[in-house]
């Protein structure tokens, strides 16, 4: 599946790993696949791992990604980057996102809907595999003032994210992962 574009590549790459060879799986948005290095986890802790993060990964995509992971792997540890928990999915956009997440898992054609463009353009994607990790070399400091201040305010998790988070917890418990 070297034609699979960046957003979906970890969905397939994890299935190509030797069965039951991954101790830990990382899920979440771009912060997950640019921040946690499986090579570093191996070097420092002797732990095999794979990053199954996606750009803008939602909680329902995380759930279906984990269902995919558990087809061939039995990781004892799931590391979840939680930015997506607080992403609001409301109105028609929320409905489209929910249906898209379900469709992407069950219908391969939907997941690969843009591969034909790459084939016609003669574009090929590299086969470099860093266990789902992506190097990010364009880091720039934020200079527009304070954006995180400590307060007593509690941010509630949107209901759709909470629904899928509960499903993720049940799935992980069922499969013996923490």
What residue spans do the PLM features occupy?
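Alpha-helical scaffolding within the catalytic cores
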Residues: 9-12, 64-67, 163-168
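Short, compositionally biased "basic patch" segments
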Residues: 1-6, 35, 133-139
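Acidic/histidine-rich, surface-exposed loop or edge segments in extracytoplasmic proteins
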Residues: 24-25, 44-51, 144-152
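Secreted/periplasmic serine-hydrolase-like ester/acetyl group-modifying domain
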Residues: 91-177
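N-terminal secretory targeting modules
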Residues: 1-23
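Short, flexible loop segments at the rims of nucleotide/cofactor-binding pockets, characterized by
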Residues: 2-5, 27-28, 54-58, 155-158
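Loop/turn elements at helix/coil->beta-strand transitions in domains of secreted/extracellular proteins
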Residues: 21-22, 47-48, 74-77, 173-177
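Membrane-embedded segments
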Residues: 27, 31-111
